Amino acid sequence: MKSILTALGLLIASSACAAPQLIAHRGGTGDAPENTLPAIKLALENKAEAIWITVQLSHDGVPVLYRPSDLSVLTDHTGKVSSFSAAELARMDAGWKWGGETHPWRGKNATIPTLQSVLEQWPQTFFYIDIKSPDADPAMMASRLSEVLQTTHSLSRVRVYSTEDRYIAALPESIPHFVSRGETRTKLANISLSHQCQPTTQPGDDYWYGLELKRKVEIVEKFTLGEGVSPATLTWDKEAMDCFRSQGKAHIVFFGINSADDFRTASELGADGVMVDSPAKAKTW
């Protein structure tokens, strides 16, 4: 009887500390050129459980995978993504700058894929889609994104994020998405700095939040004769987790988890997911 109770206790403890979902940041940017088909393939081989990808709109309105505001950052071309068609982008080498001076991915078919091609190639994989288009109209992005997700029957296996609240606000209700970064950051700031648990402004009872485990910010204080600015760090801890989870069903994903220590902290806090640059390293934690 004692051994049965001991085993049951271990099972309960194990369930309570279940490991968070391992999410490959930009397809696993630490192991291969970000947001490319080879990177996604490698990340899944390295046991990533979901893929985080970055999306912009091409000149012909096609959602494609690319993050920086200029093509010169990662490819052998210059200009904005929105200046080229999806077909033209598909011929560009997105592995051109990866790997320092050795450039091991040049000429290895690490091109700029369309979102539709990615979803069709991995029909069973969960994707987090990060909208980064610097010049796309939010309504247009929402419309084109919706078309692709419906065409590929992917609405049940995606969730959309953006650092710009306007892109989240423009999404139709049919597209699963995160609570805006602005609201998430403000809510965490109130807990971290003032120990106040701010009610959510979002309707419903199921919420997804995403933010860095530790986020450096500047606090602006206004005085009679001017303003004072002081640095501060927003940190997730038990108080923060309890607050977020006291208001409906909260799912929390931590960004920038790139060490065993941070992964352990995220696991102990009960994070639902962690975003890592290198699934190859993360699978050893």
Residue ranges of model-derived segments:
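Positively charged n-region of N-terminal signal peptides that target proteins for export
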Residues: 1-5
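N-terminal signal peptide c-region/cleavage motif recognized by signal peptidases
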Residues: 13-15
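Phosphate-group recognition and catalysis centered on beta-loop-alpha active-site segments
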Residues: 17-285
